[in-house]
Amino acid sequence: MLCVVTSDNSDFRLTAKADIPIGHKVALKALKAGDTVIKYHEDIGKMVGDAEVGGHVHTHNCKTKRW
């Protein structure tokens, strides 16, 4: 997939490791349990499991502050 960094309009390519449903997140870097999850420059939660680059990030491995 083509990823665009909105703050500086740069871009890069990333391969998703699986089909990622709409509304779910894709790990842009390797994430380990305990890491902070950032979305649109905001801290939205903590990882409770690992995700590799291109991995699926959702409730199975991320505990959001929202819930």
From Swiss-Prot:
Keyword Lyase: yes
Catalysis: reaction(s): (2R)-3-sulfolactate = sulfite + pyruvate + H(+)
Top-tier EC class: lyase
Signal peptide range: none
The organism's place on the tree of life at top rank: Bacteria
Keywords tagged on the record: Cytoplasm, Lyase
Function (record text): Together with SuyB, desulfonates sulfolactate to pyruvate and sulfite.
Enzyme Commission number: 4.4.1.24
Name this polypeptide is given: (2R)-sulfolactate sulfo-lyase subunit alpha
Entry GO CC: cytoplasm
One MF annotation (Gene Ontology) recorded for this entry: sulfolactate sulfo-lyase activity
Chief place of localization: cytoplasm
